[in-house]
Amino acid sequence: MCPGNWLWASVTFMARFSRSGSRSPVRVRGALEEPPAVQHPFLNVFELERLLYTGKTACNHADEVWPGLYLGDQEIANNHRELRRLGITHVLNASHSRWRGTPEAYEGLGIRYLGVEAHDSPAFDMSVHFQAAADFIHRALSQPGGRILVHCAVGVSRSATLVLAYLMLYHRLTLVEAIKKVKDHRGIIPNRGFLRQLLALDRRLRQGLEA
């Protein structure tokens, strides 16, 4: 399990979970416009949170959640020896900042790097990064021997959200299918704002398939 990290994430989740019946919806500034079916998303989000909190809740510093795709935390991203052992060729950092991750950190390892400066806040618009992150993951896995680590600080919210979006955009999984696929290998807890944005993406993709 992730020492300390999962306990922190679980406490954070329970705080969200316990308030689900009393809070009115919060508009995510600049986020994808939600279609009518998710304009009042708490029931849908509540059900997703219940799904997220069932089944596998353990995690390692990195878990392979899709062939060649590892979801992990900052500690594994800093461990060059472990990155070599796993054969990582690309790193997507969803908690990029001047203090956390730069391309220079992987000089000499032959690792391609993409940083997304995201905040683990329900008000943060992660949806603007969905396509670019999914494209980067796809390019990594399309090259021979390509393996990618997608990480943030803990590896359960920001990075997990981008992995779910990738599975939806490139493999046409529904959001529920993507969550179940990832949770077969790692416990994740995207924050409520990220879940709303994923629901909006899910609806848009489903409408596109039906058109």
From Swiss-Prot:
Query: What is the uppermost EC class here?
Result: hydrolase
| Keywords of the record | Cytoplasm, Golgi apparatus, Hydrolase, Nucleus, Protein phosphatase
| UniProt-annotated catalytic positions | 152 (phosphocysteine intermediate)
* Subcellular location(s) of the protein: Cytoplasm; Nucleus; Golgi apparatus
Q: Name one GO molecular function term.
A: protein tyrosine/serine/threonine phosphatase activity
- GO CC annotation: cytoplasm; Golgi apparatus; nucleus
User: Does this entry carry the keyword Cytoplasm?
Assistant: yes
Q: Which InterPro entries match?
A: Atypical_DUSP_subfamA (IPR020405), Dual-sp_phosphatase_cat-dom (IPR000340), Prot-tyrosine_phosphatase-like (IPR029021), Tyr_Pase_AS (IPR016130), Tyr_Pase_dom (IPR000387), TYR_PHOSPHATASE_DUAL_dom (IPR020422)
Domain (Tyrosine-protein phosphatase) spans: 60-207
EC number(s) given by UniProt: 3.1.3.16, 3.1.3.48
Catalytic activity, per the record?
O-phospho-L-tyrosyl-[protein] + H2O = L-tyrosyl-[protein] + phosphate; O-phospho-L-seryl-[protein] + H2O = L-seryl-[protein] + phosphate; O-phospho-L-threonyl-[protein] + H2O = L-threonyl-[protein] + phosphate
Iron: present as a keyword of the record?
no
Assembly and binders: Interacts with HSF4.
Function summary: Inactivates MAPK1 and MAPK3 which leads to dephosphorylation of heat shock factor protein 4 and a reduction in its DNA-binding activity.
Q: What family, per the record?
A: Belongs to the protein-tyrosine phosphatase family. Non-receptor class dual specificity subfamily.
Q: What is this protein called?
A: Dual specificity protein phosphatase 26
* Source organism (scientific name): Bos taurus (Bovine)
